[in-house]
Amino acid sequence: MIDKRDFKAFKLVSKYAPSGDQPQAIETLVDNIEGGEKAQILLGATGTGKTYTMSQVISKVNKPTLVVAHNKTLAGQLYGEFKEFFPENAVEYFVSYYDYYQPEAYVPSSDTYIEKDSSVNDEIDKLRHSATSSLLERNDVIVVASVSCIYGLGSPKEYADSAVSLRPGQEISRDQLLNALVDIQFERNDIDFQRGRFRVRGDVVEVFPASRDEHAFRIEFFGDEIDRIREIESLTGKVLGDADHLVLFPATHFVTNDEHMEQSISKIQAELADQLKLFEAEGKLLEAQRLRQRTEYDIEMLREMGYTNGVENYSRHMDGRSAGEPPYTLLDFFPDDFLIMIDESHMTMGQIKGMYNGDKARKQMLVDYGFRLPSALDNRPLRREEFESHVHQIVYVSATPGDYEMEQTDTIVEQIIRPTGLLDPEVEVRPSMGQMDDLLGEINLRVERGERTFITTLTKKMAEDLTDYLKEMGVKVKYMHSDIKTLERTEIIRDLRLGVFDVLIGINLLREGIDVPEVSLVAILDADKEGFLRNERGLIQTIGRAARNADGHVIMYADRMTDSMQRAIDETARRRAIQMAYNEEHGIIPQTIKKDIRDLISISRAVEAKATEAETNYESMTRSERQEAIKQLQKNMQEAAELLDFELAAQLRDLILELKAMD
């Protein structure tokens, strides 16, 4: 078992002090957690600094914390913010490592088998390994995750028990170490030294842990004893220092020892025999032949290599679980007394609920037609009630908590006051008759003042028609639809802020996570059409997009007042009254947020430009110039990785290797 380091407290680093009603929110949340409250809601209005409040709570309760977001983009933003707040602690990132993923499936109507096809992002895989190893080695850990955290991951006990612990002076032969590394799925490659690999040079073994991307370790032997362990730069071999202890975790999360492997294979064979009998009794000879061929091949691979493609489908046997028992997930790597924070909980909890059913429907088809054993159904995401069983203490964070969260707890901590003094916007309702001309007049007013406008519609056709109409009227406008990729979306938001265009039209893209202080008008068309996009929560989230500007204003175009509209307007007015009273009492004049227009796109392009320049000129460089270029590229590679632009980081890494090969 791995001995954790001495307890280290979380240390929050920030130039800001809590303000507005952050202090009371922080104090109440902390008191409730320390008092044993299982669940509570942080109801924080848009722009009130919920992430900062979360960070303050984590630093005061000093518990390992899992922060769950509903998509990779939001998880990436939170990861960056927590890294800034906690530079001395372990802040980790755990999302799906697939850049592309086509799950294994079978379509009976056309007799089409779709083989699993995927592209794994090496950088995210490294970050996942970093998260699990940190959780087993230390206490001061924050993991920011997507709903990937409820998917099967392999047994934390097997993962920890398989780890190889090394110290100077330890009696172990070089060959014993090599065998131990192979057992935990490290691959020997004396030429191409990458994560999850090792190389051997005489009495020196160099190992590249799966959780690192720059630093490797050099283990020097004297006979059958470790003489010294040194940390080195993986690219240059430069020695960074000596280590008095090294723990090497497996290169894959699905790992088991030889004894357990044989037991697992016996169980797989027994299940195969039972399923073959069932198919033959039902006259499904094709399915029986298919299942026998596939499973026996996988068994042979497991025996010889300890691994096979799709090994996760046998995880129930390898983990020693019973049928129907939940899989091990990231949650099992945390200690019992850990804290969960669910960001944008009204979205995230819905995702957690929905993952299981979709996964089961697809896998059941594979089982019925002989592509997989029934135990493959137990390689699955957790059900919501199974997720709940892992909860020791939880904080739901949202401006608009969902029904589920409200059912879980009566403890609601409000954070309504913005540190900037900004108020929730005024909301007015206007008739839909003549709305185009009315809206055009409002847009022109904002353009004259150098401000921006958001317009949200209900249908794609209406968004397209409105875009065409406004263009004809001379308005600089863009329509952001669901086919636009994340990076393009970031670029569109940046262009809106820069004034490349003045109006952005969308359907469901104008709610969570879009921060544009220049927007002073939000127009909601068809506000009286009740439904997912026009319910109370959807309307409050959309109204919140105008809450970062001192002149924020919202116009709902509708022919009648629905209950959802009334509740959204009343809640906004309630918050606005609280904020105005606070400002008056403290002599605060609301100021529009001044936020630098600096984002992933612009920085990535600057880095990419430097990379392209270096690539164009490096052949004519002197050796010393090349060394300087390498240093700059390594810095750029780090910047790209920190921005989660892993594709660019990989390109820069390859360019660095080319430059080094020239010397």
Curated annotation (Swiss-Prot):
Coiled coil: none annotated. Residues 31-271 form the Helicase ATP-binding domain. InterPro entries: Helicase/UvrB_N, Helicase_ATP-bd, Helicase_C-like, P-loop_NTPase, UVR_dom, UVR_dom_sf, UvrB, UvrB_inter. Residues 627-662 form the UVR domain. The keyword Iron does not apply. It is found in: Cytoplasm. GO terms for biological process: nucleotide-excision repair; SOS response. ATP binds at G44, A45, T46, G47, T48, G49, K50, T51. The beta-hairpin motif is involved in DNA binding. The UvrABC repair system catalyzes the recognition and processing of DNA lesions. A damage recognition complex composed of 2 UvrA and 2 UvrB subunits scans DNA for abnormalities. Upon binding of the UvrA(2)B(2) complex to a putative damaged site, the DNA wraps around one UvrB monomer. DNA wrap is dependent on ATP binding by UvrB and probably causes local melting of the DNA helix, facilitating insertion of UvrB beta-hairpin between the DNA strands. Then UvrB probes one DNA strand for the presence of a lesion. This is UvrABC system protein B. It comes from Streptococcus equi subsp. equi (strain 4047). The gene is uvrB.
